[in-house]
Amino acid sequence: VPKVTRRGGGSALPYKRRLFGNIVSAAVKATEGTNIPVTVKMRVGIDDEHHTHLDAGRIAVESGAAAVTLHGRTAAQRYSGEARWDEIARLKEHLADTGVPVLGNGDIFRAEDARRMMEQTGCDGVQVGRGCLGRPWLFAELGAALRGESIPAEPTLGEVTQVILRHAELLAEHDGEDNASRDIRKHIGWYLRGFPVGGQVRAGLAKVNSLDALRELLAPWADSDALAADADGARGRQGSPSKVALPDGWLDDPEDDCVPVAADIMNSGG
């Protein structure tokens, strides 16, 4: 995310090895006396010329991280192309002597993907990102696959409408109905991917402004046994590869541990 990396955060941070280590160490120290584990998630690096994951993985472990997750893309790739699972395998091998779990992330859209990633990379587990957008049942499928059990059947359209309503109700309990009605709109598109509901219904759902309106729009589909066509796959924006925005002189000295100017006002990840 440019607004994050241009301040030295997100995928730009591990390039500054000492600064990265200081931050992980501080987080670990802050949790002393608790049972809260500090874990680190990172990308392969800034771009193909600046891979950071092997050094950063080792630094994270030495700084006390309980687990390390690698998304198999560089920041420059955004979500384009395919995740480099071979880099997850490299990190797992690199940290094998530490005993610290290495988790894989990137292009996990179905249960089979998780099983295949673990088989190909030797990673200790997987983290799911975009693949669960509009598909929260994916986690039950992943659990079944990794336990060697039968994969649960995909939900029908009627069942999905009930999940949408429950999601919206929980949002309303947390953020109020007005905010919930706005926030659920983006999720509805993901939930209904591949279902034959028609453009007019989708347009109405994209403008829903209350829970009652949502219930009314979804009611005709409550008993539908339709199944989604081609519902798995990438969700959200994929983008195109692009140059990563960095602070001036960021690449000059990887051992510089100075905190970038205004870094403390941006803490949303990246």
Segments from the language model and where they lie:
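Active-site-proximal loop/turn and secondary-structure-junction residues that shape catalytic pockets
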Residues: 1-3, 42-48, 72-76, 108-110, ...
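A short, structure-level motif marking secondary-structure boundaries and short turns
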Residues: 9, 40-42, 72-74, 99-100
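Glycine-rich, proline-tolerant flexible connector loops at the mouths of alpha/beta enzymes
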Residues: 1-17, 70-80
